[in-house]
Every structure is written in structure tokens, then in C-alpha cells.
Regions:
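Small-residue-enriched flexible segments
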Residues: 1-41, 45-51, 58-327, 331-343, ...
Length: 377
């Protein structure tokens, strides 16, 4: 399987880049499209559709290829996978029946392939991404191979989209179903944040709404451990969410990051980026330093050494929170990941990352870099 990545600031630039990269006889069959919500999605999809290319796409909080990181632009990974080795499924969930929709997708995938694996992207801030994962597990078991992310909208947190040929939705899912007998897909989710303090107990929560930890309002604890001062609704900013990160402990595998997204100032509770069950164990996180990047790259080196030594292409779902917290250093992380396999890469800064925790279960992650490695068998 051959892969090439292209990028551009407009549909016309994508048209030119596509023509240039197909000039040597390269005939891509699948495009992994990451683009700003400000871009003309219909025009970009028409260019690819007219070229006979199947589309898996999502809007982003920033996008990148090996050429560098951009905001407000378009990044595309072109693959010439045999069309018999994949199919694309697209569904909406207006009734919030997330689990049932992915159960249906899993059943459809089994009609096509005996051993399917999945590259997924979901849209809508109200989508229960964990329910999406559970739906696949219901049909295919706990070991199902899934990687992906949730769409963004340039940090507006209002409306994001997933897309395919002639379709896009702000409330749905797009899935590339791969034949795992023909295509090897491996993923590695790594965050690298260091824990601080003792293990604590969530004493009151409902879903993703955390009220108290060790019977103390959760905002008060995060102010303490984050070293914040004079925190008020007026001076609280998105960047403070970087401080409000908890490591949710799991019985099996690595912890899972949960970031604070919204504060309820009436009771100092916090709405988090995913479920935090009452009674669960958590630790707070230190603000990131440079070895966060080193840990992510080391995780990829271990993946290469132990599971997939060669690759045809890389896709990276990197949390938007990592971009906020690491700033320009994020380019070093992306470059370091690409250099492990030295193949074309494209990726997005996502609202959430969907992947198996290292030595653990499928999870919805936050502040995590989810590297997806593809290799034709």
C-alpha cells in the first residue's frame, strides 16, 4: 500500500496537490481528511469524489501532515488500498441511540469481513463516545480493534462535523471498516502526564459531572494541586482546563485522562471530558514538561519493536488539550512519532481520542496522543 500526504489552505490548493501527486500514476482509493470547520467541506469532498476516492473525514481543532501544523486549513492522507479491503459506513444518531448505532455498524461490518477493524470519527459535543465503543464491543467482543477521535471546530466548542462522499453531519459517525486479514492496524494511546499526590476517591458524581473527591468540592482540590490563585468565573479560561486533569485509575492497564471542561460555580463541581464513576479512584496531574513528548515517542518505539515493525502510513489523533499545553513543542512530538516509522502522516487535534488503553480496555481518552499505524499484509 502506498501513501502520500497533502495539505492546503483552500479547495483549489487541494485540487492542485492532488493532481500533482497523482501525476506519477499514483491512484488513491481512500482519503483521510482533516480540515477546519471554516473550510468548504462540500468543495473538498467533490474534488476527491470526482477522482473516485472514498472519503473518511472530520473537522478539527487544527490539523497537520509531515509538512507541519496548521490551523484553519486542510490535511489529507491519500492511500491506494485495494477497494476490496475496506468499506466506509456513515450513520447519524438523532435519537441519541449511540450504542445501538454502533451495534448496527458492527453487524454490517461482519457481513463484509470475517475479521473487521475500525477507524472511526464522531461529531457532536453531546455524543457519548464511550457508548459508541460499547456498541462495537457488544457485537465483536472486548478485543475489537478500534482507533479514532471526536471532531473539533477550531476550539469554538459549538458545532463539528464528520463527512464522507456526498454526506456530512454534525451528529453522527463515519467509519472505515478494514479487513484485518489484509490490513494490519495497530494503535498506541499515550499521554505522559505525571501524577501528583495520593490516590483519591470520587465521593459524588453523575456520569461526567463530578461533585466531590474525598468529600471536597473537586474545583477546590484542582485549585490546590494546580497552584491556581484567585480563581473566579471572570478570570477562568480554557487554558485552566490543562490544570484540571485527573488520571482515572483502571483495574487493568494504564490510567485514563479526564479533563475538566465546565465549572459549576454554585457548588464548585466540574463537568469532565468523559464518565467518572462515583467510587472510582483518581489522581491529579502535574502540568506537563518536556518528557511528556519523550514518553509518547517511546510508546511508539515500543509499538514498533513489539507489534508492527514496518508501516505504510500513520494517522495521529492528538488531543486539542496537548496543543494548548505544549504549544510549539507539539511539532516535536508529531515529528518524533513520524520518524519512528518514517512514512507519510496526517492527523488532527481532536476533542477526544478513541483507542485501547495500553494493556487495558477501549477507552475515550483526553490529553492523549493516539497513534494509528497501517500496513498492508
Amino acid at each position: 500500500m502506498k501513501a502520500k500526504s497533502i495539505c492546503g489552505t483552500s479547495p483549489s490548493e487541494i485540487q492542485s496537490a492532488l493532481q500533482q501527486n497523482m501525476g506519477d500514476g499514483f491512484k488513491p482509493t481512500l482519503a483521510v481528511v482533516f480540515l477546519s470547520v471554516k473550510q468548504d467541506r462540500v468543495a473538498v469532498c467533490k474534488i476527491l469524489d470526482d477522482a473516485g476516492i472514498a472519503i473518511y473525514g472530520a473537522t478539527t481543532n487544527g490539523e497537520f501532515t509531515g509538512e507541519g501544523v496548521s490551523a484553519g486549513e486542510i490535511a489529507i492522507l491519500l492511500l491506494d488500498i485495494n477497494p476490496a479491503y475496506f468499506t466506509i459506513l456513515f450513520e447519524e444518531f438523532p435519537d441519541k441511540n449511540f450504542r445501538q448505532i454502533t451495534q448496527f455498524i458492527a453487524k454490517k461490518a461482519l457481513e463484509k469481513f470475517a475479521h473487521p477493524c475500525f477507524l472511526i470519527a464522531g461529531s457532536n459535543l453531546n455524543t457519548d463516545a464511550e457508548a459508541l465503543l460499547h456498541g462495537f464491543e457488544d457485537i465483536l467482543g472486548k478485543e475489537v480493534n478500534i482507533n479514532g477521535g471526536m471532531a473539533g471546530d477550531d476550539f469554538a466548542f459549538k458545532e463539528n462535523f464528520v463527512l464522507t462522499n456526498k454526506k456530512s453531519t454534525n451528529n453522527g459517525i463515519v467509519v472505515v471498516v478494514l479487513d484485518e486479514d489484509k490490513i494490519n492496524m495497530k494503535g498506541r494511546a499515550t499521554f505522559g502526564w505525571k501524577p501528583v499526590g495520593t490516590v483519591k476517591t470520587v465521593t459524588k458524581s453523575e456520569g461526567n459531572h463530578v461533585y466531590t473527591i474525598d468529600d471536597t468540592p473537586v474545583l477546590d482540590l484542582t485549585i490546590k494541586y494546580g497552584g491556581l490563585e484567585n480563581v473566579t468565573p471572570e478570570n477562568f479560561a480554557l487554558e485552566h482546563c490543562i490544570t484540571l486533569t485527573m488520571q482515572l485509575q483502571r483495574e487493568n492497564g494504564d490510567p485514563v485522562m479526564r479533563a475538566g471542561l465546565v465549572v459549576d460555580w454554585n457548588d464548585h463541581s466540574i463537568y469532565c471530558s468523559g464518565h467518572v464513576p462515583q467510587g472510582s479512584k483518581v489522581r491529579f496531574s502535574l502540568p506537563p514538561d518536556f518528557d511528556v513528548i519523550e514518553k509518547v515517542i517511546k510508546g511508539c518505539e515500543e509499538l514498533k519493536a513489539n507489534e508492527i515493525p514496518e508501516a505504510d502510513a500513520l494517522i495521529l489523533f492528538n488531543c486539542a488539550g496537548r496543543l494548548l499545553s505544549l504549544g510549539p513543542l507539539i511539532s516535536e512530538e508529531i515529528n518524533g512519532i513520524q520518524e519512528v516509522w518514517n512514512v507519510p502522516i496526517a492527523g488532527m487535534f481532536s476533542n477526544a481520542e478513541l483507542a485501547r488503553a495500553t494493556k487495558g480496555n477501549l477507552e475515550m481518552h483526553g490529553f492523549t496522543a493516539c497513534t494509528v499505524v497501517l500496513k498492508e499484509k
